[in-house]
Amino acid sequence: MSGVLVVIPARWAASRFPGKLLADLGGEPLIVRTCERAAAMATADRVLVAVDDERLYAAVTAAGYEAVMTGEHACGTDRVGEAAAASDAEIVVNLQGDEPLLDPVDMDRTVHALHEDGEADIATLAHPFVDEQEWRDPSAVKVVSDDWHHALYFTRAPVPGAHPGGEGDAWRLARRHVGIYAYRREALARFLALAPHPLEKREGL
């Protein structure tokens, strides 16, 4: 068992913009731009797009990338799990289909984090917020971590909280989560075996 498999879950439906993954971005569909970024990762041995619609499949394969049709799933991670089931990759990277601007060097860091820390099972990315307005935006997922960069909580709410009048620059203490996860194969299997938690469903994460 070895190697790194990057799976890009891509579904047609979207609450605000159905079919957005085929939106033009510099002459190519958004999903193809995301594939280009994934393929540029130094750590990636294989890039696979897990789709639920023939239009997405056609766009991805026409651009020369590998795609697989998947069934109905409640979340992208479940779709990744189905696509990765036939692979023996040691690490599976879940890269969201609408992340065409991520730097491949940063994406590689998630894989390196697992190689460097034998006790870590999952790695992801986050960066500082630009300002308080971005921090308050519910579409921006927040993560609060400890001094060792272990995530404590992911939420759409503006965290950390503060006593009335003491909020100040609380937004500087959180980070904005980025849509990529690197899993050890066993950790992904354990996650997929869990029932969705009420907090997960409430937050839509």
Regions found by a protein language model. Give the residues of each.
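N-terminal glycine-rich phosphate-binding loop and ensuing alpha1 helix
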Residues: 3-50
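Hydrophobic/aromatic residues located in beta-strands of well-ordered beta-sheets
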Residues: 6, 47-49, 92, 122-123, ...
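Conserved core of the sugar-phosphate nucleotidyltransferase
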Residues: 104-194
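Donor nucleotide-sugar recognition loop
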Residues: 195-205
